[in-house]
Design a protein with these regions (language model features):
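Sequence/structural signature of beta-propeller domains
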Residues: 1-234
Length: 234
């Protein structure tokens, strides 16, 4: 190997290379982990890997331009388990890109996206996915940029049961949506807007990374579609 592992410190400092030597699976740019509030599963975003030439079960698409999400479940739903199972929860992409190959299509139901990055499941079980595709980016189809295929980076709600995706908010030009925190009652979300371009957030001034606040005014949790007493919230 290009690294001499003489001590444990060598392995810790060069952990990626050490993992390769140990036979670890090379993943497609793992980014965020989140744990379901009932501790039943762990999810991991694999943002993309345009350089993948050989697929494997956990990274099933060569030239994986749009990424995927993995789900891990401990045997017997026990924190003491020594074994776990895993599945590909979702593959990102868009059927409109099928002309460029089946590896670009994905299996998202509803609002499609590329390059899942930020990931969190709130205490009521709502999964929130934040994206980080390059700008303008390569969609995989000649003449179509990622911006043209998917728009700006955004934040999505994804139903864990039917995998239906709904776009929640869209970031300004050039940004990555990353980071999510919330108040205990879930009526207020704090979302980070990182490295925007143009003149956001103040017109005519240099762009600045910022944290925005999203607040429900009817005392309901952000993402809850039901109003008190019936009817759907907007």
């Amino acid at each position: 190997t290009p690294v001499d592992f003489n001590t444990q410190a060598d392995a810790l400092i060069n952990c990626q290379r050490a993992a390769r030597v140990a036979g670890g699976t090379v993943m497609d740019r793992p980014e965020w982990l989140t744990v379901a509030p009932d501790n039943s599963a762990v999810f991991c975003t694999l943002t993309n890997n345009s350089g993948r030439g050989v697929a494997d079960p956990a990274n099933p698409r060569i030239r994986n331009l749009h990424g995927h999400i993995l789900k891990f479940s401990e045997e017997g739903n026990s924190p003491l388990a020594t074994k776990f199972s895993w599945e590909i929860f979702l593959t990102a992409g868009d059927p409109a890109l099928a002309a460029g190959g089946s590896n670009l299509v994905g299996d998202i139901e509803g609002d499609t996206f590329s390059s899942p990055d930020g990931l969190r499941i709130d205490p009521e079980g709502r999964m929130w996915v934040q994206t980080d595709h390059s700008v303008p980016g390569n969609s995989g189809v000649d003449g179509t940029t990622i911006d043209q295929a998917f728009g700006h980076n955004a934040m999505f709600y994804v139903d864990q049961q039917n995998k239906q995706s709904k776009r929640f908010l869209v970031g300004p030009l050039g940004c990555e949506i990353t980071g999510l925190a919330y108040t205990p009652d879930l009526t207020t979300f704090f979302v980070n807007i990182q490295h925007p371009t143009g003149d956001w957030p103040v017109a005519g001034e240099a762009p600045r990374s910022s944290t925005i606040v999203v607040r429900r005014t009817d005392s309901q949790p952000v993402g809850n579609c039901q109003r008190p007493g019936g009817g759907r919230a907007r």
